[in-house]
Amino acid sequence: MEANVTIPIWQNKPHGAARSVVRRIGTNLPLKPCPRASFETLPNISDLCLRDVPPVPTLADIAWIAADEEETYARVRSDTRPLRHTWKPSPLIVMQRNASVPNLRGSEERLLALKKPALPALSRTTELQDELSHLRSQIAKIVAADAASASLTPDFLSPGSSNVSSPLPCFGSSFHSTTSFVISDITEETEIEVPELPSVPLLCSASPECCKPEHKATCSSSEEDDCVSLSKASSFADMMGILKDFHRMKQSQDLSRSSLKEEDPAVLISEVLRRKFALKEEDISRKGN
């Protein structure tokens, strides 16, 4: 009977490590006190700034810093600034403040760079437009020179013709009507003003007797032919390469492009420029490889 009797722990004899549950836990798990909160005093604080406020920070200081409006340099209530608009933070404080703020300017610049068009494509477009305008002016000069050579014949200035009495300003007005030739573009419909042809003053300076009515009868047909050939040579000299490209392109046109108008100079110009820049890109890619 005595062996089956249960003895409660509080009636057990207090000896050794079994006399207290707290001591038993303490032997296996030593408990250390939490570190106390420590406050660091700010250097270079004058006694005038302290005033009646205690220098020891409290929970009120934490609330005051949280309620401060965008002042990351605020520390405690004792750090008062009577003249707020004249106070300037030190460079070290500014560096700490800038380091704590994320750099959003770099991400904005990247987004703007993605939205903007690529610079190589823009420069290529401007080059195409410049070359197209140059070709327009050259073709307009050729057409004007052809019209002038067709109207300027030996019969026009011959002594026995009926047109001897006609004044030269009429010829200038017809020249002005021919120089207003404009080629329509596929991409843009703006008209480009063609500069005046240098063949008109060249013609008048080469044969000043032809410009005067009283000396028209003395101008021979050989001098007229020389003047016309000189003006035509000056206008056609710089267009031989372009006309050769046009001729090659007309010969190598596919049957699928039969719907396009072969007489349209804008289509021919755009095709020549497209092939020219395609060859340039192939050469650049080969050099890079």
From Swiss-Prot:
Share the record's PTM remark: Phosphorylated by AMPK. Upon stress, phosphorylation by AMPK is sufficient to induce mitochondrial fragmentation.
Subcellular location(s): the record lists: Mitochondrion outer membrane
Where are residues bearing Phosphothreonine located in the sequence? 27
InterPro entries found in the cross-reference section: Mtfr1 (IPR007972)
The processes (GO biological process) annotated in the record are: aerobic respiration; mitochondrial fission
Superkingdom as given in the UniProt entry = Eukaryota
Its membrane topology = Peripheral membrane protein
Q: Which GO terms describe its cellular component?
A: mitochondrial outer membrane; mitochondrion
- Which UniProt keywords are given for this protein, alphabetically ordered? Membrane, Mitochondrion, Mitochondrion outer membrane, Phosphoprotein
Phosphoserine is found on: 38, 100, 107, 221-222, 235, 258, 270
PANTHER family to which the protein is assigned, alphabetical: MITOCHONDRIAL FISSION REGULATOR 1-LIKE (PTHR14215:SF3), PROTEIN OF UNKNOWN FUNCTION DUF729 (PTHR14215)
| Functional description taken from the UniProt entry | Mitochondrial protein required for adaptation of miochondrial dynamics to metabolic changes. Regulates mitochondrial morphology at steady state and mediates AMPK-dependent stress-induced mitochondrial fragmentation via the control of OPA1 levels.
Which family does the record assign? Answer: Belongs to the MTFR1 family.
Q: What is this protein called?
A: Mitochondrial fission regulator 1-like
- Organism, scientific name: Bos taurus
